């Protein structure tokens, strides 16, 4: 939906004492991403320009985390309440006259659809203030919404509320839509005559009422969206809610989960329909998984692209790799960054690859290291094969062309080039290039000494 001019201020200055951490509270992760990135993404998705973050404790760390986002920052050097925090952003918004959203950096679960409802209601009613509210069975600690019928009269904080007001279940989420010029004018007249000696943003509602302006409200359909994070217990609770939301969205899109409560997927991960995800799987970063894939238990995949019909067996780790279709990986395989599998491959148990391009149909079934290597199509790598790529100073490349058969327990001392359709005998150490269609052997000739043990081992002398 097209909206009037939009801007956003995101409050991210709090120290988060109850987190008991040197790290700023808003940088603690939810589903693998710093929690502040969720409201930032929501504001930017709705076209909020400018988007201003009010920072304080750990300001440099927060700025560094968001350095690539089109946002600006305002410093709140002293924590004097939410009203004071918004005033700190005034200079960055002095030319702005549209709808101003106020979001919280420690409220990461707010859905885009909810933000859309808040904006639409605020613009439709032409209110000076529209507050996002929620109904809680246990509202202790939250500011209560004071109403007269459908009209919002104000908000009273927990420490300032009367006994009767504390029975109200509708609470302030701390998320607002304001008419920008009005809110800054109203804040200029706000004092700190309250129990906390802070500048309450909620006093703006009283100023709007006094000016005869409308104060509106939008009630959350799901109160969990307004969950603020103040300690590590709430961090874990919010993480579980986000995980459930991500997994349910994927299930509705055609992905099967054996146990969604034990599966950890970051929000930007994409999975195609008819894929099956087992418990203990962790998928993160820029990961895209195709259709019909099977990801078995205790697999970790980060920053990888998997084509259709890929089978990743238990205990495998994939990082920064591309995997072609109809490929089997694992169990207990490790694909390190720079691995590219063309498709129809087998990378078996205890195989490690790094900066390896492996051609169509090639396989390494077990106990192998392939690093800084280029393999052609239909190459068979025998058990125990190692590309010796590092000389203590530099890395070197191994090239193995199409249709090569490599026997077990082979070492390729790079740089080395193996021609197509050649055969490498088991137990060989290959230090020189091998031409196409050749047999290469480097092991010594077998020698048999008859009765050697009977002559040299006292334990065996009486067994003749």
Curated annotation (Swiss-Prot):
It catalyses: alpha-D-glucosamine 1-phosphate + acetyl-CoA = N-acetyl-alpha-D-glucosamine 1-phosphate + CoA + H(+); N-acetyl-alpha-D-glucosamine 1-phosphate + UTP + H(+) = UDP-N-acetyl-alpha-D-glucosamine + diphosphate. UDP-N-acetyl-alpha-D-glucosamine binds at residues 11-14, 25, 76, 81-82, 143, 157, 172, 230, 336, 354, 369, 380. Binds 1 Mg(2+) ion per subunit. GO terms for molecular function: glucosamine-1-phosphate N-acetyltransferase activity; magnesium ion binding; UDP-N-acetylglucosamine diphosphorylase activity. The keyword tRNA-binding does not apply. Residues 1-232 are annotated as: Pyrophosphorylase. It comes from Syntrophotalea carbinolica (strain DSM 2380 / NBRC 103641 / GraBd1). Its EC number is 2.7.7.23, 2.3.1.157. Disulfide bonds: none annotated. This is Bifunctional protein GlmU. Residues 233-253 are annotated as: Linker.
């Amino acid at each position: 939906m097209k909206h009037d001019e939009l801007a956003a201020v995101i409050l991210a200055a709090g120290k988060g004492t109850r987190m008991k951490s040197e790290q700023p509270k808003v940088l603690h992760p939810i589903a693998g991403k710093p929690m502040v990135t969720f409201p930032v993404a929501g504001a930017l998705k709705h076209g909020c320009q400018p988007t201003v973050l009010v920072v304080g404790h750990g300001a440099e760390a927060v700025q560094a985390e968001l350095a690539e986002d089109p946002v600006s920052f305002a410093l709140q050097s002293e924590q004097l309440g939410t009203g004071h925090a918004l005033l700190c952003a005034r200079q960055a918004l002095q030319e702005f006259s549209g709808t101003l959203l106020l979001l919280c950096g420690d409220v990461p679960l707010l859905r885009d659809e909810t933000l859309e409802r808040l904006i639409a209601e605020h613009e439709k009613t032409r209110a000076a203030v529209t507050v996002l509210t929620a109904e809680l069975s246990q509202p202790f600690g939250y500011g209560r919404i004071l109403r007269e019928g459908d009209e919002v009269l104000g908000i009273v904080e927990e420490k300032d509320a009367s006994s009767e007001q504390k029975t109200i279940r509708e609470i302030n989420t701390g998320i607002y839509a304001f008419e920008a010029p009005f809110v800054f004018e109203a804040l200029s007249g706000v004092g700190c005559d309250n129990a906390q000696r802070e500048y309450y943003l909620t006093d703006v509602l009283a100023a709007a009422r006094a000016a005869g302006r409308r104060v509106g409200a939008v009630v959350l359909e799901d109160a969990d969206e307004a969950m603020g994070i103040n300690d590590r217990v709430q961090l874990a609770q919010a993480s579980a809610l986000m995980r459930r939301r991500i997994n349910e969205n994927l299930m509705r899109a055609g992905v099967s989960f054996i146990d969604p409560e034990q599966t950890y997927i970051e929000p930007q991960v994409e999975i195609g329909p008819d894929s099956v995800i087992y418990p203990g799987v962790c998928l993160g970063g820029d990961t895209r998984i195709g259709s019909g894939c099977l990801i078995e238990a205790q697999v970790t995949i980060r920053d990888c692209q998997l084509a259709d019909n890929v089978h990743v067996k238990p205990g495998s780790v994939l990082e920064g790799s591309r995997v072609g279709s109809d490929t089997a990986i694992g169990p207990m395989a490790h694909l390190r960054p720079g691995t590219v599998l063309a498709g129809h491959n087998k990378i078996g148990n205890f195989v490690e690859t790094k900066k390896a391009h492996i051609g169509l149909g090639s396989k390494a079934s077990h106990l192998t290291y392939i690093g800084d290597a280029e393999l052609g199509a239909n190459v068979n790598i025998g058990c125990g094969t190692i590309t010796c790529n590092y000389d203590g100073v530099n890395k070197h490349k191994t090239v193995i062309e199409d249709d090569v058969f490599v026997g077990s327990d082979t070492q390729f001392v790079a740089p080395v080039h193996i021609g197509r359709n050649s055969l490498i005998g088991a137990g060989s150490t290959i230090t020189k290039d091998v031409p196409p269609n050749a047999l290469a052997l480097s092991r010594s000739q077998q020698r048999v000494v008859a009765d050697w043990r009977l002559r040299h081992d006292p334990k065996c002398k009486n067994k003749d």
